[in-house]
Amino acid sequence: MHLNFQRKDENGNLDENWNKAVANRAFRQCFYKGIDFTNYYARTNKINPLKCENDYYTMPGVCYNTKGEEYTTLVAKEMGFDGQAYDGKTMIRLRDNGGDIADLKKQAMEELSAIGVTFPVHCYHYIKSGDTTALDTATVLKQCFSESLGDDFVVLDIGTYVSSLYKEVRNVQLHSILQ
């Protein structure tokens, strides 16, 4: 998931609420340490949804450095995940805290309220208009956000584009997140 730090509204004005929120480290850590994507992954792999988990930007076996070391193992080591392996039950990044972000959420809400951010923060995700599969998947993603972060903190809003994600959404920065 890629976060947009300069989101704009449909009139081209900066979305100060989102932009201030996403600039806050505790807010971003809530996304990273708190969102359980298991049901979202199940849209792709119903039997073993956590096989879809990817915390390393690429999948294992794709990239190697000049010493022959596999890229994802190097990243896992840097992230402190080098001792972690697929267990089929819990996403790797949720294991340390069990997905409990109550303290981070409280910290983020206090820090952000102090600078004028209002809650819930709206996170905009766009799908192609008329694509029922994309809508079903986005609805599951919205539920993951709701169950993991709470509707009092962040609400995922699903928007649509007609023909070009790049031209209609990404280029004009309407999105909060891209996948």
Task: State what each model feature region is.
Residues 146-179:
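Periplasmic binding protein-like
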Residues 5-7, 35, 60-62, 125-129, ...:
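Short, flexible loop/turn elements at secondary-structure junctions
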Residues 21-148:
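Append "and occasionally in soluble cytosolic enzymes with long acidic Gly/Pro-rich linkers
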Residues 17-18, 107-114, 164-174:
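Generic recognition of flexible, low-complexity loop/linker segments
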Residues 2, 133-136, 165-170:
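Short, solvent-exposed polar/charged micro-motifs at secondary-structure junctions
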Residues 1, 121-124, 174:
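Intrinsically disordered, low-complexity cationic segments
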Residues 7-27:
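Short helix-loop capping/hinge motifs at secondary-structure junctions, enriched
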Residues 1-11, 38, 42-44:
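Extracellular/periplasmic solute-recognition and catalytic clefts
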